[in-house]
UniProtKB/Swiss-Prot annotation:
Residues reported to bind substrate: 61-63, 93, 276, 307
Cofactor details (free text): Binds 2 Zn(2+) ions per subunit.
Binding site for Zn(2+) 1: 59, 61, 150, 303
Pathway connected to this protein: Pyrimidine metabolism; UMP biosynthesis via de novo pathway; (S)-dihydroorotate from bicarbonate: step 3/3
GO molecular function: allantoinase activity; dihydroorotase activity; zinc ion binding
Binding site for Zn(2+) 2: 150, 177, 230
Cofactors named for this entry: Zn(2+)
Family: Belongs to the metallo-dependent hydrolases superfamily. DHOase family. Class I DHOase subfamily.
Record's protein name: Dihydroorotase
Source species: Streptococcus pyogenes serotype M3 (strain ATCC BAA-595 / MGAS315)
InterPro entries: Amidohydro-rel, DHOase, DHOase/Allantoinase_Hydrolase, Dihydroorotase_CS, Metal-dep_hydrolase_composite, Metal_Hydrolase
Gene designation per UniProt: pyrC
Cellular compartments per GO CC: cytoplasm
Function: Catalyzes the reversible cyclization of carbamoyl aspartate to dihydroorotate.
């Protein structure tokens, strides 16, 4: 048993926000009250700390199978726990791609060994070929939670329409990475800084928002649920809002890097700041924050994308892989760039990092209640920390190394067990 004493208990589902004690027995919260005594429990003094549901991150890359020099499911789980994250959804762009039941079962068997809750998407198309839709029914029955070809866009509208119909028939949804390659230049560099500093055509805004426009309208026609991943452009927020007003079933996520910083970071952080979609302009950054405030964007998800340091340390930045490690900085970036400046309340930030992503997938997570799951994070919301290369992840490709950020995770509890510090 674990007894958490005197913490500020914040639950986005009930909107509870009060200093209270929380008693955990086994994998459940058994009591939340102003004062609880329990002689046999391990006591955690949470005085002055926030006690919240464990974070739910629905967009991570754990690189297993096939790319375990970058990350694996075990180190990914450790990184999640260090960041206060107790539930994750992995993407299918592994090697081999999670397109068939056999690969899916191998991945889930590895995930089951970890102490946090690890789910995975399967791919929309066979080995990401963009043509042949996978067997949604068989993959769902084998444990996939939804479908995405994340990492690359789905170019064929005909295939997308077929996939939406299949998703509807199987009561699931599709998540999409929106960057039209026919309208894009070099990926990972926003068009402005690409032209001005690097003298080539970069990743354009129109490649993102035109593809979102196409896909939300096909979803509208098919009455299918589409989830837009890591949108980064001001116009993208407006397109999603328009589709939602029409009555389309559209949800959207933003990654912490896109509300925290801009394209200029490429000049100082180098390849660590190279990602798809790229860091954009200040106008775009403020627009995605407005999207979070208005409710157009309901989910914050990291797109945790670890890479080996040698892969990022190339002389030609265009040859470096895109992506950054994000699980261990996401809460701090939200506290520093959304709560501290007054864009979101702490409760609203927590809602977008816990309850909303859990509701999207139907997970029993993202809330604190008696008889509910004992998945919690305990953190100091105002305490500052210096971001260093010492991550639990195998990777250290973060453009935020050297930054002072608010928010220090003190304990992460998953299934009633302290998983951080471990």
């Amino acid at each position: 048993m674990i007894l958490i004493k005197n913490g500020r208990v914040m639950d986005p589902k009930s909107q509870r926000d009060q200093v209270a004690d929380v008693l955990i027995d086994g994998k459940q919260i058994v009591k939340i009250a102003s004062a609880i005594e329990c002689q046999e429990a391990q006591v955690i003094d949470a005085s002055g700390l926030i006690v919240a549901p464990g974070l739910v991150d629905i967009h991570v890359h754990f690189r297993e199978p096939g790319q375990t020099h970058k990350e694996d499911i075990h180190t990914g789980a450790l990184a999640a726990a260090a960041g206060g994250v107790t539930t994750v959804v992995m993407m299918a762009n592994t090697n081999p791609v999670i397109s068939d039941v056999e690969t899916l079962q191998e991945v889930l068997a590895s995930a089951a060994k970890e102490k946090i809750h690890i789910y995975t998407n399967a791919s929309v198309t066979q080995a990401f070929n963009g043509k042949d839709v996978t067997d949604f029914k068989a993959l769902l029955e084998a444990g996939a939670v939804s479908f995405s070809d994340d990492g690359i866009p789905l170019e064929s509208s005909k295939v997308l329409k077929e996939a939406f119909d299949l998703a509807n028939a199987n009561q699931t949804f599709i998540s999409l990475h929106e960057e039209d390659p026919q309208l894009n230049g070099v990926l990972g560099f926003n068009e402005g800084i690409a032209e001005e500093h690097f003298h080539f055509c970069g990743a354009t805004g129109v490649a993102e928002y035109s593809m979102i426009a196409r896909d939300v309208m096909i979803a509208y026609d098919r009455q299918a649920h589409v989830h837009i991943q890591h949108l980064s452009k001001a116009e993208s927020v407006q397109v999603v809002a328009f589709a939602q007003q029409l009555g389309a079933k559209v949800t959207a996520e933003v990654s912490p890097q896109h509300f925290s910083t801009t394209e200029d970071l490429l000049l100082t952080a180098g390849t660590s700041a190279k990602m798809n979609p790229p860091l954009r302009t200040q106008r775009d950054r403020l627009a995605v924050i407005e999207g979070l405030k208005s409710g157009v964007i309901t989910v914050i998800a990291t797109d945790h994308a670890p890479h080996h340091k040698d892969e990022k340390a190339v002389d030609d930045m265009t040859k470096a892989p895109s992506g950054m490690t994000g699980l261990e900085t996401s809460l701090s970036l939200g506290l520093t760039h959304l709560v501290e400046p007054g864009h979101l309340t702490l409760m609203s930030l927590l809602e977008k990092m816990t309850l909303n992503p859990a509701l999207l997938y139907g997970f029993d997570a993202g809330y604190l209640a008696e008889n509910g799951p004992a998945d919690l994070v305990i953190f100091a919301d105002k305490q500052e920390r210096l971001i260093t290369e010492n991550f639990a992840s195998k990777a250290s490709n973060s453009p935020f190394i050297g930054n002072k950020l608010k928010g220090v995770v003190k304990y992460t509890i998953a299934d009633g067990e302290v998983v951080y510090p471990n």
